Amino acid sequence: SVLSFKKADSTFPKLALSFFLISTSLPTIANSSIMGRKYFVKSNLFDKLDNKKFDIIVSNPPYSIKWAGDDNAVLINDPRYSPAGVLAPKSKADFAFIMHSLSWLATNGTASIVCFPGILYRGGAEQKIRKYLIDNNFVDCIIQLPDNLFFGTSIATCIMVLKKSKKDNSILFIDAIKECVKVTNNNKLTDENIENIVKTFTDRKDIDYVSKLVSNKEIGENDYNLSVSTYVEKEDTREKIDIDVLNKEIDEIVKRESVLREEIKKIISEIEV
């Protein structure tokens, strides 16, 4: 079962068509608006979503938009948004989309949500929601993407991968900032870039300057910060200077300077004579 969350319907027909073309047995595919009615399609029949859960959820919601939040009594008691005990801030609905996706995720499913990076480290209600997600072992991976990747924004976004049946109590952090090629004013993920990211995600192990597997306990001790840069060390690309070699070069310069001074003194003394 595949679920796509998108306000506009431009992506959904393409997704549905792709499954018609590649699969003789069509899975359940759904398109849902976070504020609108929810429907799913199986073959060519439309029915209203009830308690249907989905194996794959992909979402690229708008970043940090406003929503009613706890001003709306219905939302406060809505099981999609309230399990953490708080709702996403009214000025930043990012976690509302994430909690919405989690509510439709099957037990053995995977959800991938493109996120604004601020939700990974900001405090307040967002920190409490991160705590809920981490303490319940729902966060599987955080992937830092390159900047200028999406049309209309230069922000370096992230992907949050959620699972309800993880095999460990850790989160994989992947720094994929370098996994892109420059195309005019934007960056683009090539097939090779995508393969590299997927392989790192699948291998689920530490790679210097690329990925780090961190326990939920350590993340909790770090104020539930999910920023990739907190855990994946940046490679130091500055030129490394050998101090011993530098000191020898300085000594040689001083010696040559001393010799030159003596030669200059000699020349001056000869002129005076």
Stretches with model-predicted labels:
Residues 40-44:
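Short acidic loop-to-helix transition motifs that present clustered carboxylates
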